[in-house]
Amino acid sequence: MSTSSNASHWDIFCTVVDNYGDIGVTWRLAKQLVNEYHIPIILWVDDLNSFSHILPTLNPKLVSQCFNGVIINHWTTPLAVPYLPGKVLIEAFACELPDEVKLQLATLHKTAPQAVPLWLNLEYLSAEDWVDGCHGLPSMQVSGIKKYFYFPGFTPKTGGLICERELFAERDAWQQDPANKLQLFESLGLKDIQAQDSVFSIFSYETDSLPALCELWQARAKNDAKIHALLPKGRSLNSLQHLLPCPVDALMPGQQIKLGDLTLHILPMTDQQGFDRLLWSCDVNIVRGEDSFLRAQWAAKPFIWHIYPQEDDYHLIKLEAFIRLYCDNLAPDIADTWSKLNFAFSQGQQSAVKTHWQNLNPVSLPLLQHAKEWPIDAINAADLATRLVQFVKKS
Amino acid sequence: MKTAHEVRPGNVIMFEGSPWVVQKTETTRSGRNAAIVKLKLKNLLLNSGTETTFKGEDKIDDIILDRLDCTYSYFADPMYVFMDAEYNQYDVEAENLGDAAAYIVDGMEETCQVTFYDGKAISVEMPTTIVREVIYTEPSARGDTSGKVMKPATITGGGTISVADFVKVGDKIEIDTRTGEFKKRV
């Protein structure tokens, strides 16, 4: 398949850095722009193998293919599919555009400036105050073209948060019938989970916090309902190697590891809709990065954010900024404990993680109620795709 | 060419045929340690202002203008007066000093660089590192000595910066004028 020239299309360029985060966000955005705004989208991705984990029908060997109305081009060096300028060009998460694309933009700027696409840098999500002041600012490029910085965020002054139009309605319908979650678990090959059991999903980076929580759950499960921890093969399991019967690589989806009344379940890979439904179906979700972090909020369930570690512990500043917003309408004692739990988890403080988990009782009603109300507050009347389309119209 | 990281108040950058003096720089961290640099600029031809944002590694076309080593003499509202080694005096508008104004104090001995455009002094670049005294800050709240807990402090000259929690009133501290960051107690 070759890319046809279409001046109204948008291009999104994405480099895959951490398997599912960047591509997860851009794939959701691309689908939403096609589905809800009927904008032709070309998504350029440098690592189709990683992409295929969340889009199993993708063929990593093809240079161009189409799914959900989105043309997906393999971003090779040099480009195997020629770039034809459209209406908008988005470089996702500070990725560097291919040289031939930048050259074309510079040439167009000199010969036909009206044909230069609106150039946007879609940045990482942060709840920090400075985002308000940087969102939408032009960046003066040496070529003479202005590139605009687009910052997702939680306030009306930012670019908003990715959330599909019907998502909350679909989630509510799903959560109203407990049979849905049991059917989902069964379809994922997860056995022996009963409606009254506690089910936690875990999608974190490596951390000492996980063995601590497992130890706690093992002890606690003897007197309470059974606990099930659902983990995909990957980084979370690296922290639990000492509890596993074999190396992480040898684990099979659907495999169970019983630790007293705690059962670890190995999750199969799933597409984004499947992942959303998994988060909707668990009592607590431990998530990481940006994409799963946001989807855990939309799940309306209590969660722990294992934030991506940065130099000089700067990620803790970002965590604090989010916690400040999230806890704004939360009872002070619950807010304090939930905050401490998140900080302790992200810093691998084993004893503190256990203490705060016990004090919080994450499946308690007030926290659950807050988790249900938060998405409505956070979305601030308009999601990212909607604000992005408005931004393009105004620019 | 400079990277956005390297640009500092007082530099003059070129865009769309106009020179812009950098009045303020603000560096923040995005995801995966990538930096975002926000610049406040003033157009030297039109006298208009704007704000712009760059990735830390973005290249910026800076222009080398005439510069002179000068020392600060006095403030004649709204002009800061600087003097070179031959006792020539140059007036710089307070607005053009941007963040550097927070570090100007009477009797300061540091040598600054005054930049000229079309024969007119347009901006001042402070030395990369300066030492100032803390004239007000709250007492240490948590007894933290790691240096990671920060609190606001007012320094001589009236500027406010974030300092480590262990810093006290009367302490002399080293400041990086490019970022406005506290470096250490001296």
From Swiss-Prot, chain A:
Binding site for dTDP-beta-L-rhamnose: N19, Y20, G21, D22, Y205, Q272, R288, G289, E290, D291, S292
Keywords: Glycosyltransferase, Transferase
EC number: 2.4.1.-
Source organism superkingdom: Bacteria
Entry GO MF terms: protein-arginine rhamnosyltransferase activity
Catalytic activity: dTDP-beta-L-rhamnose + L-arginyl-[protein] = N(omega)-(alpha-L-rhamnosyl)-L-arginyl-[protein] + dTDP + H(+)
A Pfam entry, by short name: EarP
InterPro entries the record matches: EarP
Function comment: Protein-arginine rhamnosyltransferase that catalyzes the transfer of a single rhamnose to elongation factor P (EF-P) on 'Lys-32', a modification required for EF-P-dependent rescue of polyproline stalled ribosomes.
Family indicated by similarity: Belongs to the glycosyltransferase 104 family.
Annotated domain remarks: Adopts a GT-B fold and acts as an inverting enzyme that converts the beta-configuration in the dTDP-beta-L-rhamnose donor to the alpha configuration in the N-linked (Rha) arginine product.
Stated name of the protein: Protein-arginine rhamnosyltransferase
Lineage start: Bacteria, Pseudomonadati, Pseudomonadota, Gammaproteobacteria, Alteromonadales
Curated annotation (Swiss-Prot), chain B:
GO biological process assignments: peptide biosynthetic process
Post-translational modification note: Glycosylated ar Arg-32 by EarP: arginine rhamnosylation is required for EF-P function and rescue of polyproline stalled ribosomes.
InterPro entries listed in its UniProt record: Elong-fact-P_C (IPR015365), NA-bd_OB-fold (IPR012340), Rib_uL2_dom2 (IPR014722), Transl_elong_fac_P/YeiP (IPR020599), Transl_elong_KOW-like (IPR013185), Transl_elong_P/YeiP_cen (IPR001059), Transl_elongation_fac_P (IPR011768), Translation_prot_SH3-like_sf (IPR008991)
Residues with attached carbohydrate: R32
GO CC annotations, alphabetized: cytoplasm
Main location: cytoplasm
UniProt keyword list: Cytoplasm, Elongation factor, Glycoprotein, Protein biosynthesis
Short name of any one Pfam family annotated for the protein: Elong-fact-P_C
GO molecular function, one term: translation elongation factor activity
Superkingdom per UniProt: Bacteria
Pathway: Protein biosynthesis; polypeptide chain elongation
Gene3D superfamilies, alphabetized: 2.30.30.30, Nucleic acid-binding proteins
Disulfide bonding pattern of the chain: none
Localization terms from the record: Cytoplasm
Task of the protein: Involved in peptide bond synthesis. Stimulates efficient translation and peptide-bond synthesis on native or reconstituted 70S ribosomes in vitro. Probably functions indirectly by altering the affinity of the ribosome for aminoacyl-tRNA, thus increasing their reactivity as acceptors for peptidyl transferase.
Assigned protein family: Belongs to the elongation factor P family.
Protein name: Elongation factor P
Source organism phylogeny: Bacteria, Pseudomonadati, Pseudomonadota, Gammaproteobacteria, Alteromonadales
